[in-house]
Amino acid sequence: MTDVSSPAGGAASPVEMTTSSSPAATTSASSSKPLTNGANKTTISTTAGGVAPGDVPGTGSGAIPASSSSGNQVKLEHHHRQSNNNRPAATNRSSETKLRSPAGESDGASRLMTPAGSSSSPSQSPSQTQASIQTQTSQQDRLTKASTTASQQDVDEVARLFEEKPEAFEKWLTERAPPEALSRLQEFIENRKPHKRPSVTSDLFQQWMAASPTVQQKSPRSLSNSSASSLPECRRHLMDLDEGELFMELIRDVANELDIDVLCHKILVNVGLLTHADRGSLFLAKGTPTNKYLVAKLFDVTQKTALKDAVARASAEEIIIPFGIGIAGMVAQTKQMINIKEAYKDARFNCEIDLKTGYKTNAILCMPICNYEGDIIGVAQIINKTNGCMEFDEHDVEIFRRYLTFCGIGIQNAQLFEMSVQEYRRNQILLNLARSIFEEQNNLECLVTKIMTEARELLKCERCSVFLVDLDCCEASHLEKIIEKPNQPATRAIKSADSFEEKKMRNRFTVLFELGGEYQAANVSRPSVSELSSSTLAQIAQFVATTGQTVNICDVIEWVRDHNQIRAEDEIDSTQAILCMPIMNAQKKVIGVAQLINKANGVPFTDSDASIFEAFAIFCGLGIHNTQMYENACKLMAKQKVALECLSYHATASQDQTEKLTQDVIAEAESYNLYSFTFTDFELVDDDTCRAVLRMFMQCNLVSQFQIPYDVLCRWVLSVRKNYRPVKYHNWRHALNVAQTMFAMLKTGKMERFMTDLEILGLLVACLCHDLDHRGTNNAFQTKTESPLAILYTTSTMEHHHFDQCVMILNSEGNNIFQTGFAGLGAGTFGSGRGTGGGSNSNFPGDRVLQIARRTIFFFVPELDAEDDVVDSVVDSVVELSVVVLVLDSVLVAALSPEDYRSVMKTVESAILSTDLAMYFKKRNAFLELVENGEFDWQGEEKKDLLCGMMMTACDVSAIAKPWEVQHKVAKLVADEFFDQGDLEKLQLNTQPVAMMDRERKDELPKMQVGFIDVICLPLYRVLCDTFPWITPLYEGTLENRRNWQDLAEKVEMGLTWIDHDTIDKPVEEFAACADEEIKDIEFTVTTLNCNQQSQHGSEDSHTPEHQRSGSRLSMKKTGALGKAVRSKLSKTLYNSMDGSKPKTSLKLLESHVSEDMDDKSPTSPSQPQASGSMGRMSASSSTSSAGGQMVDKSKKRSKLCALL
């Protein structure tokens, strides 16, 4: 319908006005143009192919002639689609155009019916209607220009208002806009959106899959025909058409048919109509390229045979004809048409069908059906003419050939569509199987039964069996092997040299799943060896499991006869076809065999069946493997639980140690030097280290603040110490130093004012636990060796392990200092408070309970003696009821709430992970940005996390800020641990370690220490002391140690080898500074310049400056040459000493000690000249030493100092 109207205001109609001599104007039936004049509104609508109710039907072309005031005619033409059938033109092109007013309009509206001269609406005459149209047209012509201008001004004004006040426009839309305007606006918006091209194929496929099987067997055309008229009427209608029209009509009938059954039925019926054949059959090609055969899709179909009957007959008795057998078989093999006039005279004709049905076959026309590539996809056969002719003539052959050409395209399309439907259903089944794998992963029997049921229903077989192989992968040890080496298969490949019997013994079946008919339940059994050996089906499955090959058997008896390995004793007469396929796991190891027995229709299993069954086998393997892995994982989890229980027992400190520590006197913090940044643990024994930790907790008021039971705290400290390995550096002593530095930063550095008590508790715990169970190797080594820790934690490997060990200790019985709820208060707990001496444990809550108990006793029994033993026994009794006493005295154990527990554990985890230098580099820039912006409020969660992370790193590397006598010893320990890792990398990984871990480059340690200080330590301490000036000693100590390391690095560069053994000995400065100590265990190798010449011409060179003397300087460096900077520095030193200036103290002391030591041990005469001073003595002594080759006492540890003078 086309509505033509104009807006109020007199806009001209956009309908084209043409004169009678001009070409007719056409307007599409889908266009919509409004046309109004004042209060009147006229609608012009056109409909094609029918008459509206109440209208008078008209004839003609369907145009609407209407005269205007100027004598023009309004002509609206429309186009409609012609009908598929060849109807007369007058019938197919009938149309009408009507002008009507919408409901509710005034009486001025009119309705016109076409053609001209027909009766008009009952309310108006034709002349009145024509006058109305002329009036509207003239008014539109006069007001077109003014209306257009006013409309544009209105648009501009409204647009300006909307732009200035969009809120008002939105409010008007939501509150006062007419519904019609909103619907038009919504329609306009929808039309502006980009639309996807409609997929006809997808819609058709979805409609097909949603339809019922009954509807799918019938095409839409057949449904409409069956409802409209009977078959004889359709036949009479087709007979009225000429041959060309009939041929095209029949082609259109099969062109869009996608159901293969309906298509074949239509082909046979239509061929009967075209050739006047009595009945026909259609065969489709099946089978493999080497074994092809024809299957009768529909057989003996007449023009009166219904589709349902034809399909039922073909399904009940399936006819299979091999290529080359019979008339149809010869046509399929030769691709040549066969036209037989007398069937019984042809030797290829099989008269058995005629004998069964009583029908006599005379003439036969059989023709191949090929696809676009020329391959045979079917054979069509028609028999006996119905028009009195006794044979099929050339005209019938030509029509048959032409029609089958189009039918070949339709058949192939239908087959492709059928394959798509089958693939779709197959995918749905496989998705259901995948879903079942996750649903039934804890029940292997249910999973296998569900898979077998789906396979049996899809492949239409009689029986289905699954044999499971007894493998090592069924044991938990297999999963452990996979975890140890995830990139290597844990299964052992079968060697080709193994015999069949040896392979067979390794693949022994342990479980058998059997599923019979449709209504039979699954049977699960564990067959014995004798049962397996006597069963042919089990032997075939054993053959498949051993060889790993898929077996598709058409004749079981013949196959068993051809394979001598099968020695079965049971009867196999009922077994016709077997499809047997191996089931493999993720490691490509056969874990079972799936077996299908006998298709329901008696035919062998095809390649398509094997392909579908392969998918079932894959999903079955995944499900079985997944279920077995789940069972193994459960076993391993149980093992892990037992191992953790054992580990927790052995990792926890003993009760004797705990009781001893609880009874020990805890000295004051000053006696341990805990407040100082120069703290050292060298003088502390192991028990003192634990006491120092307890004192730090007490001084931070954590014991009383969180009411930590004292025996729990002591046991936890001892357990933490016990879980550190005896490595050279990352041991319990290192954890103690880190915790002490944190304590000093909190107390001396006044950082506690930025932290809550809960955060202080978390930081101290994190410091003590940050290297738990350290193995002396870093994260990179764990990743390179693919250790279980690297598999468990992909990032910050060791740090995550340290935190997990911390949690393990806390979760151990009697070690949870973060325990929630009321803490357990026993007699042992409070008894530990007695005898601590001097009130050193004043923060211990047990003392409060004991005081309450004693006051209560003497209040009620004042005559008791305070020293009486009765008092002690009564006190012990009161302690047993301490909970009641605490309630009465309002002293409840305020242990951590669940929220506080989560908070402190989060602090501990974040702090321990922050000790990874990779995390430090990630957080450093954000922290520097906050400091540079002058941040002073550190109470935000993110800012507090950054601050705690920087403090943990500062404490972790705080050994670099210790006094020099402490720092260089710690550096030796770190270097030794690194060198051990480097040795492991050479031994296990066969790789060259980095310089800091290479024992052969240990001389570079001072230089590497300087680099470590410059890159990590100094920037960190600088920014911390700039923000928190109370921790400046860390920065100053680091600067001092950097100067020492730099000085030592320069001397090593000059040729001083300060390391000569696997363990690092004292540096040069330590000996140089000890002027009063006698040096006994150092071997000196002194090289002078031209010693022989000097002994002969001493007077000659006595006045020559050292730096101008000829000769080469011999260095003890490996390269044998000194750098330019070293030569310059050495020359200046020697020149200044010869000029009488005071040399450096270290060199002077060194020279004196060397000369005295060499003089005492040298066999030279005492009358040797001494005028040359210390240098002369050094030269003489050195030459004598070199000549004599004397050695220092071998029983002492020896180090080598090479001094170049």
UniProtKB/Swiss-Prot annotation:
CDD domains: HDc. Keywords: Cell membrane, cGMP, Hydrolase, Lipoprotein, Membrane, Metal-binding, Methylation, Prenylation, Repeat. GO terms for biological process: cGMP metabolic process; signal transduction. Residues 259-411, 443-624 form the GAF domain. Its cofactor is a divalent metal cation. It is found in: Cell membrane. It comes from the Eukaryota. A divalent metal cation 2 binds at D771. Residues 1195-1205 have a biased composition (Basic residues). The modification Cysteine methyl ester is found at C1202. Residues 654-1052 form the PDEase domain. GO terms for cellular component: membrane; plasma membrane. The keyword Repeat applies. Residues 1098-1109, 1152-1162 have a biased composition (Basic and acidic residues). It is an enzyme of class 3 (hydrolase). Residues 18-32, 62-71, 118-140, 1171-1191 have a biased composition (Low complexity). Residues 1-153, 1093-1122, 1152-1205 are annotated as: Disordered. Binds 2 divalent metal cations per subunit. Site 1 may preferentially bind zinc ions, while site 2 has a preference for magnesium and/or manganese ions. Its EC number is 3.1.4.35. Transmembrane segments: none annotated. This is cGMP-specific 3',5'-cyclic phosphodiesterase. It comes from Drosophila sechellia. The gene is Pde6.
